Amino acid sequence: MAFVLSLLMALVLVSYGPGGSLGCYLSRRLMLDARENLRLLDRMNRLSPHSCQQDRKDFGLPQEMVEGDQLQKDQASCVLYEMLQQSFNLFYTEHSSAAWDTTLLDQLCTGLQQQLDHLDTCRGQVMGEKDSELGNMDPIVTVKKYFQGIYYYLQEKGYSDCAWETVRVEMMRALTASTTLQKRLTKTGGDLNSP
């Protein structure tokens, strides 16, 4: 819980930082939506972390992609969008509806959709015609493979409560990582290769 509160405080501080040329990407609204989505995921916790230890799994979150300096500005926006889209797809399923409190789940899906809508508008402003060539880029494929592993895991575990709890914790990691990328974009004004 302390980690989540620290993360929330960091998000609040970032939301007041300079947006530079990426004001569209990193608006206060987008950061507030990200913070609310993390808070909702935290509230969705129904099981003790110790009760599901046998189901824990390393899904291979591509952290080097969001923490390293491998991505250009347009790639970073595509990775952020894909992370949010895949997260939305994961929670907007019949299996997910059976596993979670529907009120919290609906709020989470609405929040993710709001972030997607905002990023989609921003991506259109920056990307223009590059969008089609970036659709097949390695970072996007990596994100898709990461989420495919999560889907396979849920199927393998029969969509059990512990499997969903493991995925909920992983989604908190994934959305935190995407927020880290947003913060890096804010600090560097969009140039991920600057110090």
From Swiss-Prot:
Gene Ontology cellular component terms for the protein in this record: extracellular space
GO biological process terms, alphabetically, are: defense response to virus; female pregnancy
Keyword line: Antiviral defense, Cytokine, Disulfide bond, Hormone, Pregnancy, Secreted, Signal
Q: Which cysteines are joined by disulfide bonds?
A: 24-122, 52-162
Q: Where is the signal peptide?
A: 1-23
Tissue and organ expression note: Constitutively and exclusively expressed in the mononuclear cells of the extraembryonic trophectoderm.
PROSITE patterns, alphabetized:
INTERFERON_A_B_D (PS00252)
Compartments where found: Secreted
- Name the domain of life: Eukaryota
- Give the Pfam families listed for this entry: Interferon
Under the GO molecular function aspect, what terms does this record hold?
cytokine activity; cytokine receptor binding; hormone activity
For this protein, the record's InterPro entries field holds: 4_helix_cytokine-like_core, Interferon_alpha/beta/delta
Q: What does the UniProt function comment say about this protein?
A: Paracrine hormone primarily responsible for maternal recognition of pregnancy. Interacts with endometrial receptors, probably type I interferon receptors, and blocks estrogen receptor expression, preventing the estrogen-induced increase in oxytocin receptor expression in the endometrium. This results in the suppression of the pulsatile endometrial release of the luteolytic hormone prostaglandin F2-alpha, hindering the regression of the corpus luteum (luteolysis) and therefore a return to ovarian cyclicity.
Q: What's the miscellaneous note? A: IFN-tau genes are intronless. They evolved from IFN-omega genes in the ruminantia suborder and have continued to duplicate independently in different lineages of the ruminantia. They code for proteins very similar in sequence but with different biological potency and pattern of expression.
**Family to which this protein belongs:** Belongs to the alpha/beta interferon family. IFN-alphaII subfamily.
Give the protein name, as stated in the record.
Interferon tau
Please give the organism: Capra hircus
Its gene is IFNT
